[in-house]
Amino acid sequence: MGTDISDIVVSHQTSLKDQANQVFAIDTYNILYQLLSNVRQYDGTPLMDSSGNVTSHLYGIFYRTVNLVENGIKPIFVFDGKPSPLKNRTLEIRQLAKEKAKAELEEAISRGEENLKQYYSRINYITPQIVNDTKELLTYMGIPYVDAPSEGEAQASYMTRKDADGVISQDYDCLLFGAKKILRNFAIYGRRKVPRKNVYRTVYPEYVMLDEVLKKNGINQDQLIEIGILVGTDFNEGIKGIGAKKALALIKKEGNIKAVLNKIGKNIENLDEIIDFFKNPPVVDVKYVFGKPDPKKIEEFLCVVHDFSRDRILEHINTYVKYYNKSVQFRLDSF
């Protein structure tokens, strides 16, 4: 979900080729939820193998990783760890929304509706099996992954202050965590339908630079965090009626979030803890190593274990190995 500060960010249209020869830390759960929502069969049910295992995520991770490497990008996947207790309320709200969607799905089925995608797409769970399958596929593809101690986007953002060039994520929360660069829309560009509306718009890959956002708005990192909190984050609901532009104006006028809250007579529970979490989240220093792809293992895992089309997979495996060899050169260098 993240924080909606889009009205005050500076974004630049780009292409994957323009980002070549860079290392990107990927907010993996952000990507997995996209895949589980969007990669579905015509009736809305997720892709599954003959054993009934969901494979939507494997389809998406494989093809998106091929696309990244083909364009010269070195990806490192970052997985979420244990969520902060500050996130409990948000997780409860999401669970209630899923239960409501389940009830609506059952009603739609009983009415005989055929297109159930809008219901299924709102009921997504990242299970331990989905996580383990994703890691297994990445291992066969020679792609490193990192287990974050807590929030994946916090770990990925921290990595941009070390060795990574940026974060791949749709969430602007990464800016609050200090990511120096975000790459958005890398896999959803093109003509896309606006959710719940019969309207289409063209989406392009874009990048956002943290320093540019701060400079444009005349604020520092602490103030950006406080703007995000006023708008709402995964750790708080925000103040009703305050969007990014209004939050920016209030912070610049009053100086800090506590002065703003005092001025408008509002309160944000656990404010100090939320601010501290954005500034000092649990992260780890890691050494990531790019391995050598194992085409046979990739083929066996996708085509034998999970029933993917062999002809199509083999074609893309060959493409992947070709470009991986060129961009990563099978070196066991750490970044």
Swiss-Prot record:
A Pfam family annotated for this UniProt entry: XPG_N
Stretch list, region I-domain: 115-255
Gene3D superfamilies associated with the record: 5' to 3' exonuclease, C-terminal subdomain (1.10.150.20), 5'-nuclease (3.40.50.1010)
Cofactor: Mg(2+)
PROSITE patterns named in the record: XPG_1 (PS00841)
One biological process term in Gene Ontology: DNA replication, removal of RNA primer
Chain residues that bind Mg(2+) 1: D27, D80, E151, E153
SMART domains listed in its UniProt record: HhH2, XPGI, XPGN
Domain of life, per lineage: Archaea
Keywords: DNA damage, DNA repair, DNA replication, Endonuclease, Exonuclease, Hydrolase, Magnesium, Metal-binding, Nuclease
Binding-site positions, Mg(2+) 2: D171, D173, D234
EC number: 3.1.-.-
GO MF terms, alphabetically ordered: 5'-3' exonuclease activity; 5'-flap endonuclease activity; DNA binding; magnesium ion binding
Co-factor binding details: Binds 2 magnesium ions per subunit. They probably participate in the reaction catalyzed by the enzyme. May bind an additional third magnesium ion after substrate binding.
Region annotation N-domain: where it falls in the sequence: 1-98
Function of the protein: Structure-specific nuclease with 5'-flap endonuclease and 5'-3' exonuclease activities involved in DNA replication and repair. During DNA replication, cleaves the 5'-overhanging flap structure that is generated by displacement synthesis when DNA polymerase encounters the 5'-end of a downstream Okazaki fragment. Binds the unpaired 3'-DNA end and kinks the DNA to facilitate 5' cleavage specificity. Cleaves one nucleotide into the double-stranded DNA from the junction in flap DNA, leaving a nick for ligation. Also involved in the base excision repair (BER) pathway.
Family matches, as HAMAP family: Fen (MF_00614)
Family: Belongs to the XPG/RAD2 endonuclease family. FEN1 subfamily.
Quaternary structure note: Interacts with PCNA. PCNA stimulates the nuclease activity without altering cleavage specificity.
Descriptive protein name: Flap endonuclease 1
Lineage: Archaea, Methanobacteriati, Thermoplasmatota, Thermoplasmata, Thermoplasmatales
Gene: fen
